[in-house]
Amino acid sequence: MRRRWAQMMTVAVLAVVCWTPPLHASLAGRIERILQSTAQRENRFGIHVVDAETTPRIPASNMKLIATAAALHYLGPDYTFKTEVALLDGALVVIGYGDPLLGDERIDPRHGRAPGWVFDDIVGALKDRGITTLSDVFVDGTFFDRQRVRPSWPPDQLNRWYCAEISGLNYNDNCIRVEVHNKGSAVVVNLDPPTRYVTVVNQVKPTSRGASAVEGLRTSEPNRVIVRGVCRKSEGFWLAIEDPTAFFGVLLYERLQAAGIRVEGKLAEKYLRHDKRLEVLRTYPTPIREVLERSNKNSLQVAAECLVKAISAENTVGRINGEWPHGLRLIGRYLEGLGVPAEEFHLDDGCGMSRLNRLSPATVTAVLLDRYRSEDWPVFRDSLAVGGVDGTLDGYFREEPYKGRIRGKTGYLDGVRSLSGYAETPGGMVVFSILTEYPRTSTYAAIRDIVKAIFDEAP
């Protein structure tokens, strides 16, 4: 198949734009003018544009494109994450199979599920059987290994939702909502869901002027958090918890107590999922399509990392201890199978939070082209944010003719801005990938203008 046009720039704006024949001078000129503007002259861009009918390159959250594409390659579009609830000799057992969306704030309302529905359903299943006493409660997250964060993730941000821990048993995006309310003479801090799992040290001061500013800081004691700052009326934020499997177990235990179901023994984490005596009461499924969507449309980090570990677990004897190193090696093999040279990528996580990730823009376009040509293209396409319509592109490309015609994934880290995806032009689908590194000025407008130029000038 014929390459219509392609461009690669990694320059400080002095760069000469190189094109493979035939020379697409109009687009080259427009992009060059954008990059030569006073605002962008000191910034570094990496850009790769190809016709979607032909061949082949990026980091930050654009890494999620690689993870989701590889997940479709290895797991398939019909793959389902699940969580099982079972009985075993009088004990209640909950087994996680890496579902990142159990209790997810966006997916649950879509299915008409109220907050905490899974615990209410488990209680209902027990009461339907007339069970009022349990010997023990066990939670099993061994579908994934015990490494819950990447060493390269910033230590001072591990309390943020976008650095949440990863487990075989996840709940509520592995976060808790902290709500702060000014009651006049004092400030009250509430947790949602309410639980004893997290201990709050309230250091928030009430104020009658200015804006509220509150934050949560971890301490050396797991899940003991200092909430500090000033609060004028009400303020809230998401806080990543430590040890998601234990978090789910405690929430379940507390709900059982509230419902009058007595636990005579202990609450513990235990490997039980291959025990043939398990009597399954409930299975809660989540299709991979929803996980891909939360990863790509909304940039949910937990979703992307669970895909990486699921790739590992499903390709391990015994389907156990899915891990980052193995999952990332398999993703690397997928890239090499597309003809991407090994020196053009280095993978350190699935979400792009790690600053050790290295991808050329041509690597990203190779992956995007592979998905475009695959049988599961509609699944991958629907996972992407749509310009002017939804996801992280909701506020961009709202005007015609771009609205609804740009699909892609944004990326942001300190010093990195990126956007990669597809432009559905009148002449056909075009694949693009844009990366800026360590810009000295804002590059948002320039990136959007480049995408518009790609759309306008496509053959």
What are these regions (language model features)?
Residues L27-T55, A268:
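A short, well-structured edge-of-sheet supersecondary motif
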Residues E53-A70, Y74, D78:
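Short active-site loop at a secondary-structure junction
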Residues M1-T10:
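Bacterial N-terminal signal peptides that target proteins for export
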Residues R57, N298, V308-P459:
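Small-residue-rich helix-loop
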Residues M9-C18:
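Bacterial N-terminal signal peptides
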Residues G29, I34, H73-A342, D456-E457:
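Conserved serine DD-peptidase/penicillin-binding transpeptidase domain
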Residues L23-A25:
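Boundary at the C-terminal end of the N-terminal hydrophobic targeting segment
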